[in-house]
C-alpha cells in the first residue's frame, strides 16, 4: 500500500496545542493523528485511525486465540438493566443520561456487564453451553468531570471488554488466567512497559482484581513494588500491616491535659515534648498521636449522608483515593463547617473518638489502631488532649478502613522487603466478578444433575485508544513519535529530498517496489515542501523506518534510518532487499 503525503488529509503543527499537558497529547495533535472536537472528545484523523485499527487487530487476535467470540452491543442502552444492578445510581454523575421523545431513560454505555449477562440468559439454558467467553471492541462514554491528557482521559474512548461465563469457580479461575496471559501477550507485542498490580474491584464488585499499569511519570495511578519479591499493587489496594495488639491491663492511665494552641499534629508534638510527656520512656513523635478526620459517606440511592470519623496515626496523611476506593460504591466527602455547627459535640481541632462513640457516630480506624494501643488524641474540648487513650478500653471502632497514605519504604507484605512507589497509566483491568450480575439478572442454568445453577462471571477490559496514547507516551523523543512496527500506520516513510528528476523518478520506482513486497509505505512526494520540513515531519510522524533520497543519491546511495538510530547509506540497488530483510527479522 502506498499513501502519498501530497494527497493525505494531514496538517502537522510546529507548536504544542495550548491545552496539552502530557507528551502523548501534544504529539498526537501536532502530528495530525487526532483533533479535538470538544472537551474530552477527539476526531480520529487518517493516520490516527490507521494506528487505532492496528491496535484493535492485536487485541482481536489475542482474544480470538483464547476462544473468545466477538459481538457488538449498542452504545445507546436502556435504563432498566442498570437499575437491576443498581449502577444507574452507583455511577453517579459519570453516566451520560438522556431521554427519548417519549420520556424513556437511556444512557451511553460506560461498560456492558448488564448487556452480556442479559444476552447469555436469553440464549443459553444448559450447562452444555458453557463455558463461553464473549467480547466486543466498542466506544464507551463517561462524563469525566475534568477530561484531560487527550485520549488518555477522555469522555469518549475505545475499549475491548470481554466476559467469561463458567459453571464453577474453578472454571472462572481458568478463564481469568487465560485472559491474564492474553493481556500479557498483547502488551508484549506492542512493546509496552507495564506492571501487573493487585487492585480494588470498586463499583464493579467481585473478588480477585488486577490492573495492568503502563509505567509512566505522567500516570494518574500510583502503584507500589516490593524491593525483595514479586509483590505489586495499586496504592488503593495496598493492605496496611495491622498493629500489634497489647494487653489492656498493661495500658497506661488515660490523662487529660490542657494543650494551648495545639490544633495541629505538629503543635501537639511540640507541646508534648516541651511538657515532658513521654511514651514508653521516649519523646513523643507524630506517630504516637491519633488523627481524627470527619467525613460524610453517602450510600448509593440514599438521600442523606452518614457522618463518620476516620482514625489514623498522626504521622500519616489521608489519601483520598484510598479512602474513596475503600467506601465504593458509596461516595465520601469531608465534613463541612455546617456539620460542625449542627453537631456541637464536635470540637474542631480537638475531636477524639470518645465523643464519637458517645453520640453514635460511626468510627472507622486504620489497621494500626488495634486493641491495647495507646494514643494522644483530642479530648473533645478546646485546647485539651488525652494522653494514653487506649483502644478497646477508652474507645471502640466500628470497623477498619484503608485511608492512610502509603510511603516509600513502608514494609512490604510477606517479608518482601520494603515498598517503592511509582506512577502508571491503567491500560487493562481484569476481575473475577463472581455471581453479582448473573444473580441480578436471574441467569439460571440447568446443571449436570438437572438442578438450577447460576453461572459465575469474569470481566476483562483493556483500553484500545488508551493503549495508543500510552505508546506515544512511552515511545517518543524530543523530535516526535516512535511507533512500534506492529501498529505503526506505515512501516516505511520514503522522503524525496532531492528535486532532480532522476531522484523523483527513483522515488516512485522505490515505493512501487516496496509495495510489491506488501510493505505499507508513506511517500513524501510533496513538490513544494523543503527538505528540512520533510525531515521534521518524518521525525514527528514516527514511522519505524525512514528512507531518504537526498544528496547521497547522486553517488548511487540512499539513506536508511531506523527510528531512533543512526542513518546508514545503502546502495540504491540494494535498498529494497535491505528494507525487506529488516522488516522480516
From Swiss-Prot:
PROSITE patterns linked to this entry: AA_TRNA_LIGASE_II (PS50862)
Origin superkingdom: Bacteria
Catalytic EC class: ligase
Keywords: Aminoacyl-tRNA synthetase, ATP-binding, Cytoplasm, Ligase, Nucleotide-binding, Protein biosynthesis
InterPro entries for the chain: aa-tRNA-synt_IIb, aa-tRNA-synth_II, aa-tRNA-synth_II/BPL/LPL, Anticodon-bd, Anticodon-bd_dom_sf, Pro-tRNA-ligase_IIa, Pro-tRNA-synth_IIa_bac-type, Pro-tRNA-Synthase_IIa_type1
GO BP of this protein: prolyl-tRNA aminoacylation
UniProt-listed Enzyme Commission number(s): 6.1.1.15
UniProt keyword Protein biosynthesis, yes or no: yes
Catalytic reactions on record: tRNA(Pro) + L-proline + ATP = L-prolyl-tRNA(Pro) + AMP + diphosphate
PANTHER family in UniProt: MITOCHONDRIAL RIBOSOME PROTEIN L39/PROLYL-TRNA LIGASE FAMILY MEMBER (PTHR42753), PROLINE--TRNA LIGASE (PTHR42753:SF2)
Name of the protein: Proline--tRNA ligase
Natural source organism: Corynebacterium diphtheriae (strain ATCC 700971 / NCTC 13129 / Biotype gravis)
Amino acid at each position: 500500500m502506498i499513501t502519498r503525503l501530497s494527497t493525505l488529509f494531514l496538517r502537522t503543527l510546529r507548536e504544542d496545542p495550548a491545552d496539552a499537558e502530557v507528551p502523548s497529547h501534544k504529539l498526537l495533535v501536532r502530528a495530525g493523528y487526532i483533533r479535538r472536537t470538544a472537551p474530552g472528545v477527539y476526531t480520529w484523523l487518517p493516520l490516527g485511525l490507521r494506528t487505532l485499527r492496528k491496535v484493535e487487530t492485536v487485541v482481536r487476535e489475542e482474544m480470538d486465540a483464547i476462544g473468545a467470540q466477538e459481538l457488538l452491543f449498542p452504545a445507546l442502552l436502556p435504563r432498566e438493566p442498570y437499575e437491576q444492578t443498581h449502577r444507574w445510581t452507583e455511577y453517579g454523575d459519570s453516566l451520560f443520561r438522556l431521554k427519548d421523545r417519549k420520556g424513556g431513560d437511556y444512557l451511553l454505555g460506560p461498560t456492558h456487564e448488564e448487556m452480556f449477562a442479559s444476552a447469555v440468559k436469553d440464549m443459553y439454558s444448559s450447562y452444555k453451553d458453557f463455558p463461553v467467553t464473549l467480547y466486543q471492541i466498542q466506544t464507551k462514554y463517561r462524563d469525566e468531570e475534568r477530561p484531560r491528557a487527550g485520549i488518555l482521559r477522555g469522555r469518549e474512548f475505545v475499549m475491548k471488554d470481554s466476559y467469561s461465563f463458567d459453571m464453577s469457580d474453578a472454571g472462572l479461575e481458568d478463564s481469568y488466567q487465560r485472559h491474564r496471559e492474553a493481556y500479557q501477550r498483547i502488551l508484549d507485542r506492542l512493546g509496552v512497559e507495564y506492571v501487573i498490580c493487585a487492585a480494588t474491584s470498586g463499583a464493579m464488585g467481585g473478588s480477585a482484581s488486577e490492573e495492568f499499569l503502563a509505567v509512566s511519570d505522567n500516570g494518574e495511578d500510583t502503584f507500589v513494588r516490593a524491593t525483595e519479591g514479586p509483590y505489586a499493587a495499586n496504592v488503593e489496594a495496598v493492605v496496611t500491616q495491622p498493629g500489634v495488639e497489647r494487653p489492656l491491663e498493661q495500658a497506661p492511665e488515660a490523662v487529660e491535659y490542657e494543650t494551648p494552641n495545639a490544633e495541629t499534629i505538629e503543635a501537639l508534638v511540640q507541646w508534648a515534648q516541651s511538657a515532658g510527656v513521654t511514651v514508653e520512656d521516649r519523646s513523643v513523635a507524630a506517630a504516637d498521636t491519633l488523627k481524627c478526620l470527619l467525613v460524610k459517606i453517602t450510600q448509593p440511592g440514599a438521600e442523606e449522608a452518614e457522618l463518620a470519623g476516620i482514625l489514623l496515626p498522626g504521622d500519616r496523611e489521608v489519601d483520598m483515593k484510598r479512602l474513596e476506593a475503600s467506601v465504593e460504591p458509596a461516595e465520601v466527602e469531608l465534613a463541612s463547617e455546617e456539620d460542625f455547627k449542627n453537631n456541637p459535640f464536635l470540637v474542631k481541632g480537638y475531636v477524639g473518638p470518645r465523643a464519637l462513640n458517645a453520640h453514635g457516630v460511626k468510627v472507622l480506624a486504620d489497621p494500626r489502631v488495634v486493641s491495647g494501643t495507646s494514643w494522644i488524641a483530642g479530648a473533645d474540648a478546646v485546647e485539651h488532649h488525652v494522653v494514653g487513650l487506649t483502644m478497646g478500653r477508652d474507645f471502640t471502632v466500628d470497623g477498619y478502613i484503608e485511608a492512610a497514605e502509603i510511603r516509600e519504604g513502608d514494609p512490604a507484605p510477606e517479608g518482601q522487603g520494603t515498598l517503592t512507589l511509582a506512577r502508571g497509566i491503567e491500560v487493562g483491568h481484569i476481575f473475577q466478578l463472581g455471581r453479582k450480575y448473573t444473580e441480578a439478572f436471574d441467569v439460571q442454568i440447568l446443571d449436570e444433575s438437572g438442578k438450577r445453577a447460576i453461572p459465575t462471571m469474569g470481566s476483562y477490559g483493556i483500553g484500545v485508544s488508551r493503549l495508543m496514547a500510552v505508546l506515544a507516551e512511552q515511545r517518543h523523543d524530543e523530535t516526535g513519535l516512535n511507533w512500534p512496527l506492529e501498529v505503526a500506520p506505515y512501516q516505511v516513510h520514503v522522503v524525496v529530498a532531492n528535486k532532480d528528476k532522476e531522484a523523483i523518478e527513483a522515488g516512485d520506482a522505490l515505493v512501487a517496489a516496496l509495495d510489491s513486497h506488501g510493505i505499507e509505505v508513506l511517500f513524501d512526494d510533496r513538490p513544494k515542501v523543503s527538505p528540512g520540513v520533510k525531515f521534521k515531519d518524518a521525525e514527528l510522524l514516527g514511522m519505524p523506518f525512514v528512507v531518504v533520497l537526498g544528496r547521497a543519491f547522486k553517488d548511487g546511495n540512499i539513506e536508511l534510518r531506523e527510528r531512533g538510530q543512526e542513518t546508514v547509506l545503502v546502495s540504491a540497488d540494494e535498498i529494497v532487499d535491505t528494507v525487506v530483510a529488516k522488516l522480516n527479522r
